[in-house]
Amino acid sequence: MANEFRICDECQATNIKTLIPKLKKLDPNATIDIRCQSYCGPGRKKSFTFVNNRPVAAPDEDQLIEKIKKKLKK
């Protein structure tokens, strides 16, 4: 089963223009769903992504990518 990433295109702390290429590099076969994820509170302060239906957040994008690597299905 492939990995799934869900990101918000409206949250202030998430820059989808830089995040999407990094996610594609982690798993080129993953599904990427871009829309409101109803995670607005944390999304104002931290960069976040849902990875396989689990929220992953970090103060910046580089830290987020490191956390996402640990959540990926092999």
UniProtKB/Swiss-Prot annotation:
Fetch the InterPro entries from UniProt: DUF1450, UPF0741
Q: Which residues form a coiled coil?
A: none
Q: In terms of domain of life, where is this protein from?
A: Bacteria
Transmembrane stretches, start-end: none
Q: Return the similarity comment.
A: Belongs to the UPF0741 family.
Quote the HAMAP family the UniProt record gives.
UPF0741
Q: What is this protein called?
A: UPF0741 protein BH3821
